[in-house]
Amino acid sequence: MSSVYIVEEHYIPYSVAKKLLSDVIKSGSSSNLLQRTYDYLNSVEKCDAESAQKVVEELSSIISREDVRAVLASICPITPDEVRSILIMDSNRTYTSEDIQKIIDIIRKYIKS
């Protein structure tokens, strides 16, 4: 059995996690838990992995916290109140209405219709 070493750890959007799980399942390392997790992520996915990664990257100019960017790219809120409910996680910063609108505009570019 090979050893696994964690080199880095990052927060990732749901759709990126789904893609990684898909790769593991395709390699033959599937289990009931992995399949159920994949099915759940498939049911809540609002944009593909590539688009979610672009959302995270574009949000970095507005939001410094990686975890907040990952949650936004996972949930894809499209109203100011939804965005604010997530931004509350970042208690060290106050976001303006303009910031919130920029976040919504970025998300809308990539969300599935």
Swiss-Prot record:
<keyword id="KW-0240">DNA-directed RNA polymerase</keyword>
<dbReference type="InterPro" id="IPR044876">
    <property type="entry name" value="HRDC_dom_sf"/>
</dbReference>
<comment type="function">
    <text>DNA-dependent RNA polymerase (RNAP) catalyzes the transcription of DNA into RNA using the four ribonucleoside triphosphates as substrates. The highly mobile Rpo4/Rpo7 heterodimer stalk is conditionally required for transcription initiation.</text>
</comment>
<dbReference type="Pfam" id="PF03874">
    <property type="entry name" value="RNA_pol_Rpb4"/>
</dbReference>
<protein>
    <recommendedName>
        <fullName>DNA-directed RNA polymerase subunit Rpo4</fullName>
        <ecNumber>2.7.7.6</ecNumber>
    </recommendedName>
</protein>
<dbReference type="InterPro" id="IPR010924">
    <property type="entry name" value="Rpo4"/>
</dbReference>
<comment type="subunit">
    <text>Part of the 13-subunit RNA polymerase complex. Forms a stalk with Rpo7 that extends from the main structure.</text>
</comment>
<dbReference type="InterPro" id="IPR010997">
    <property type="entry name" value="HRDC-like_sf"/>
</dbReference>
<dbReference type="InterPro" id="IPR005574">
    <property type="entry name" value="Rpb4/RPC9"/>
</dbReference>
<dbReference type="GO" id="GO:0005737">
    <property type="term" value="C:cytoplasm"/>
</dbReference>
<keyword id="KW-0804">Transcription</keyword>
<dbReference type="GO" id="GO:0006352">
    <property type="term" value="P:DNA-templated transcription initiation"/>
</dbReference>
<comment type="similarity">
    <text>Belongs to the eukaryotic RPB4 RNA polymerase subunit family.</text>
</comment>
<keyword id="KW-0808">Transferase</keyword>
<dbReference type="GO" id="GO:0000166">
    <property type="term" value="F:nucleotide binding"/>
</dbReference>
<dbReference type="GO" id="GO:0000428">
    <property type="term" value="C:DNA-directed RNA polymerase complex"/>
</dbReference>
<keyword id="KW-0963">Cytoplasm</keyword>
<keyword id="KW-0548">Nucleotidyltransferase</keyword>
<dbReference type="GO" id="GO:0003899">
    <property type="term" value="F:DNA-directed RNA polymerase activity"/>
</dbReference>
